[in-house]
Amino acid sequence: ATIAVIGAGAVGGYYGARLAQAGHDVRFLFRRDLAAVRERGLRVYSPLGDFHLEEVAVAASPEELGPADWVICSLKATALESARELVAPCVGPNTRIVALMNGLGIEPRFAEWFGAWRVFGGMAFVCINRGESGVIHHLEYGRISIGHALDDPAENATLEALLTSGNIETVVAPNLRYARWEKLCWNIPFNGLSVAGGGIGTQTILGDPELRETAERAMREVVLMGNADLVSWKSPAR
């Protein structure tokens, strides 16, 4: 398959590299790392095995990438409104779009722009960061929870097959709203406490009794909000 990766940071770069390693034609939209990846390729350090993609298809604009079978958009949620102009040049008649992003209200925007039939949501449960330009450090986990915007089982099976071909653990969520709240149960407590604590890591939070209790209380609050939201949407998943 041809795959365009928009927002090729640590997350998009890692999963795109996995798919490229599996033999797919993956093209990356890079900004900061463009020159380094063109010159030295993309290197991944991972508990699943280190690897180096010596020749990587990279571009500085989505127009250079062109239409693809799949678009993986892994922008930050704060950049959601810029996604349309970045993704549009990569969309052909049969292109599917995977919004590999955190937060709520992601898929409705993509559905509005491109049509719900081609849109998927994806939530990455992974510990990962970028090192020097063109280097990605995968530390732990790696599962992606996916769901089609119209809950089409056949579409979900197609995306699941694509991701698993790249040795990516993939789970089809009961529904997208459930999956997004599930991810927020982690993001809201730990991202918030990390920033409030001056950039402290997860292990520091878990190792401090007071911070751990704060994280647990925040998680319980997110669960309550999520379940209330799912009830209002008449979702059977809790």
Feature annotation, model-predicted:
Residues A1-T2, D69, G142:
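Nucleotide donor/acceptor-binding cores
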Residues R32-A36, T78-A79, L104-G105, A154, ...:
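Short alpha-helical
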Residues I3, D25-R27, I97, V119, ...:
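Hydrophobic anchor at the start of a short beta-strand
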Residues V5, R27-F30, C73-S74, A99-L100, ...:
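Active-site-adjacent beta-strand anchor residues
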Residues A1-D50:
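NAD(P)+-binding Rossmann beta1-loop-alpha1 motif at the extreme N-terminus of oxidoreductases
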Residues F30, L48, A60-P62, M101, ...:
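Residues at the C-termini of beta-strands that transition into short coil/loop
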Residues P89-C90, R109-R118, S133-P236:
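Internal alpha-helical scaffold of NAD(P)-dependent oxidoreductase catalytic cores
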Residues H52-V135:
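Rossmann-like NAD(P)(H) cofactor-binding subdomain of soluble oxidoreductases
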